[in-house]
């Protein structure tokens, strides 16, 4: 049986490896791929979930790293973080522009506890913001589920399609309940069982080496 897998799509952010690490800490296998990876290849991996990372660009500028609308139509839960959140909204018909006030650092954030992402998260929590663009208008079908004093869309969701956008960085420790949020996505929204361990990977690698050796000897 194929093991459950969450794919992290890299848009050039500084925390990409950390995102993958946090997913693995939820006992879910995770791999990182470039945003240039072909959609058919992603689909063939049969991921349980997809996470879009942050990045240094503005998604509305020519030549910025992007993805196709079809990525959000695979029927797989998708979580966009920072740039990934903005890109999701931009591609699906929302609006992203320069923020009147740049947010950087620990920021008090108010969340909608009815959202699956914020289950068992404090209604008022501290998150790590680092953005100069902001989502000024959410895409059709989305609902705002978190905000700050300067950021009207700190998080948004379209539960019908299992699409989630978070403007902040839940993967860093400065976001006090970030691990819980990622756990809610990976184990709750994506439905991963959380049975993966590092030792399982080593066991599989050993098995593959054994099979390769057996084939070589034939």
Located regions from the model:
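Structural motif
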Residues: 51-53
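RNA-binding accessory domains that recognize and position tRNA/RNA substrates
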Residues: 1-49, 58, 72-73, 90-204, ...
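Gly/Ala-rich beta-loop-alpha elbow adjacent to hydrolase catalytic centers
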Residues: 80, 84
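Short, well-ordered alpha-helical scaffold segments within catalytic/effector domains
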Residues: 65-68, 203
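Glycan-recognition surfaces in beta-rich domains, encompassing non-catalytic CBMs
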Residues: 215
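Glycine/threonine-rich flexible loop motifs
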Residues: 56-66
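Catalytic-core regions built around general acid/base machinery
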Residues: 67-75
């Amino acid at each position: 049986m194929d093991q459950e897998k969450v794919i992290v799509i890299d848009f050039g952010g500084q925390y990409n490896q950390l995102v993958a690490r946090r997913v693995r800490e939820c006992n879910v296998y995770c791999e990182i791929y470039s945003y240039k990876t072909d959609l058919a290849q992603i689909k063939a991996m049969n991921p349980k979930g997809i996470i879009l990372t942050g990045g240094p660009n503005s998604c509305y500028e020519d030549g910025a790293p992007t993805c196709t609308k079809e990525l959000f139509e695979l029927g797989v839960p998708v979580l966009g973080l920072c740039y990934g959140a903005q890109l999701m909204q931009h591609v699906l018909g929302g609006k992203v522009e320069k923020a009147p006030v740049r947010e950087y650092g620990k920021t008090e954030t108010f969340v909608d506890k009815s959202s699956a992402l914020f289950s068992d998260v404090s209604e008022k929590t501290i998150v790590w913001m680092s953005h100069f663009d902001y989502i000024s208008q959410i895409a059709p079908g989305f609902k705002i589920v978190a905000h700050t004093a300067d950021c009207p869309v700190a998080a948004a969701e379209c539960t019908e399609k299992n699409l989630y956008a978070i403007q902040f960085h839940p993967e860093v420790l400065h976001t006090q309940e970030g691990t819980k949020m990622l756990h809610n996505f990976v184990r709750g929204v994506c439905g991963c069982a959380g049975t993966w361990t590092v030792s399982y990977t080593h066991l599989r690698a050993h098995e593959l080496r054994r099979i390769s050796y057996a084939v070589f000897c034939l």
